[in-house]
Regions:
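S-adenosyl-L-methionine
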Residues: 1-336
């Protein structure tokens, strides 16, 4: 699990006694015993996304900047979580004008009721959240043989076309989507599936995106991916440090960054002692760009890490992706 910034400011026994409990079927147990839906309590309607949510595994606690909700059944949890990932439900939250996603607001949000969308939504939302083995029990509980017959709405080199067919009833590392592009595609398809499940039209989904999500549109308009689905450049303020900077930074060299470009299209000479930015390499049609640096994500000591991007680089069009996914799933549900 990621490192944390907070520890309980009391004896552990006192901390355990303070955990809220829930009573189901005559049994009383701490809410931390189960998987929970958790959302950021404070929201900003002018941000890229308003409603920020995930699922936390058993044993995890949080401070009051978050709100958690426990469900009696895992299927209800996934129904609610899948819906919450969509811009459709995010738009519903924006429309309240509220600054806090409290229990009153969360109780207003829709729960998936159309079962024919369940497998498609669950497969994608579980693949997004099940990054570590802490989710293996939930995966085993939710897994359906229908997961294996899912398909991406697009056939692109950035998308692993065998991802769904390789899913297994027992959680393993390849049950999670790990590339930037595949995770984006899953969210695009969830947007479409939720819109269809709620009876919206494609035009209404596009209008929601165009009018209510200007920051997301701004980021999407200039986020670029390599052939393996890795982001090489993005202006997103939520992804600071991901990819290359727009222009070369001499400070990177002082911080131990080492750049390399291996491409016949490269005319910049030897990269030794040379900083590289997105503007320097965006024209490449073949070859690779790499950077080696000290990564402090997993420990304060850091570790040497190399990130490589494969040219050429692409910029997807979210509106076009919505249109393609809409037609794909509309046909799929009609034939089901």
């Amino acid at each position: 699990m990621p490192r944390v910034n907070y520890i309980p400011n009391c004896e552990y026994s006192d901390f355990l006694n303070r955990i809220p409990t829930v009573s189901w079927d005559g049994n009383v147990f701490p809410v931390t015993n189960g998987y929970r839906f958790v959302n950021r309590e404070m929201i900003g309607s002018t941000s890229e996304r308003t409603f920020i949510a995930t699922i936390i595994p058993p044993g995890i606690s949080h401070i009051n900047t978050c709100l958690s909700t426990i469900f009696k059944h895992d299927y209800d949890l996934l129904d609610f979580f899948s819906m919450s990932l969509s811009i459709v439900v995010d738009y519903r939250v924006k429309c309240t004008g509220m600054g806090h996603a409290n229990q009153s607001l969360v109780n207003q949000l829709p729960l998936l009721s159309n079962e024919k969308f369940r497998a498609s939504l669950h497969a994608r939302s579980m693949a997004l959240v099940s990054i570590t083995e802490h989710y293996k029990k939930l995966w085993c509980s939710i897994y359906s043989s229908e997961f294996k017959i899912q398909y991406w709405s697009r056939d692109l080199p950035q998308l692993p076309q065998d991802f769904f067919t390789n899913l297994t009833p027992e959680w393993q590392r390849n049950c999670a989507l790990r590339s930037d592009y595949s995770r984006r595609q899953a969210l695009v398809e969830i947007d479409v599936l939720v819109a269809q499940a709620l009876g919206l039209t494609l035009e209404e989904l596009l209008a929601i995106y165009r009018i209510q999500f200007p920051v997301m549109r701004q980021y999407e308009a200039d986020t670029w991916y390599d052939q393996n689905g890795r982001i090489i450049f993005t202006p997103s303020k939520g992804l600071v440090g991901v990819g290359l900077p727009r222009t070369a930074r001499k400070a990177d060299l002082k911080n131990g960054f080492v750049f390399n470009v291996d491409s016949p299209d490269w005319t910049g000479g030897d990269c030794t002692d040379q900083a590289i930015g997105w503007d320097d390499v965006k024209h490449l049609q073949t070859g690779t760009v790499s950077v080696t640096f000290d990564d402090y994500t997993r420990s304060d000591e850091g570790e040497r890490r190399t990130v490589t991007w494969q040219a050429p680089f692409i910029k997807p069009d979210r509106e076009d992706d919505y249109k393609v996914a809409w037609a794909f799933f509309a046909q799929d549900k009609e034939s089901a």
